Amino acid sequence: MATMKDIAKLAGVSTSTVSHVINKTRFVSEEIAERVNHAAKELNYFAPSALARSLKVNRTNTIGMLVTTSTNPFFGEVVKGVERSCYQKGYNLILCNTEGDHERMKSSIMTLLQKRVDGLILMCSSLEGERLDVFERYPDIPVVVMDWGPMLFSSDKIQDNSLRGGYLAANYLIQMGHKEIGCITGPLIKYQAQMRYEGYKRALNEHGLPFNPAWIVEADFECEGGYQAFKKIVAKGPLPSALFVCNDMMAMGVINAANELGVEIPHDLSIIGYDDIHIAKFMTPSLTTIHQPKYRLGQAAVETLLKKINKETAEVQVIQLEPTLIERNSVVEWHDNEI
């Protein structure tokens, strides 16, 4: 019966490289992997089953991930970073959608644990402020939480600096000459929505600009929410010269509503979004926004989780990634004599 050593000799690589290719425990170039797989096939080599290996080493090389179902492509862009990083590290990914349902979320977590995943990545807004008994029953399972908080269970956390991002957005509008600046927030029970709004308020306070309650509306981070929020602002009276819309999906809804109502973006109203989702540059006008490093969020989550799985660190970590401004065409400079 052929061995890994035989495959290594035929493929012209080391035995450890053969092991990594067969067990998918490390990224190996496509050319070398093809040579190894071809040699294994030629020698009729059969690898031990994944189940047998996992029972032997108490590892499945599988990560579970829970995501809140949303029409927002932000989640898909983050998952792409997670999936690609898992592949490069030789891990499989099991992805579960919670659809915002608390019971489904708990059921999915239990299912993933029963499948003996090595660790969990959670990106569920419904987890915020929750205490989950399942993590008390499985205290040793490594968990990384992405982009939400605070949590009532111990976990590492990867998040965007939303306070800084909200400040950047409002401060940019101010630097462009705007003094009447409204805000469409996300759901303010959510930490990230709170922080973006706080950043907006901090920028206005620093420059001594007033808050007009008629220009501040809470919405839901979805297109429809932005659409309805803008109509509420219009119904309350004169518009501000600029709006900070706290994510790009809501900004898309605002642009749609503005077009229906004959409000020209950006000449009648400047808009800045948040997230820099892929379609932001294809909106009309292309959306000025705050870039979240979405791929890097996913990558950092995998790297942090693997450190916990491999027991490289025991301390709970909070890793904060910094947002940046992306200038496009939905904001124009404002002059006091403009109407």
Residue positions per predicted region:
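Short beta-strand elements in bilobed, periplasmic/extracellular small-molecule ligand-binding domains
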Residues: 86-97, 201-224
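Periplasmic-binding protein-like
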Residues: 109, 116-124, 182-184, 237-247, ...
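Flexible loop/hinge segments that line or gate small-molecule binding clefts
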Residues: 92, 100, 122-168, 189, ...
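N-terminal helix-turn-helix/winged-helix DNA-binding helices
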Residues: 1-2, 41-74, 78-80, 88-89, ...
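Flexible loop/turn connectors
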Residues: 229-339
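N-terminal helix-turn-helix DNA-binding module of bacterial transcription factors
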Residues: 1-59
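An alpha-beta-alpha
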Residues: 169-207, 214, 317-331
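Hydrophobic alpha-helical segments within soluble ligand-binding/sensing domains
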Residues: 158-183, 195-202, 223-232, 251, ...
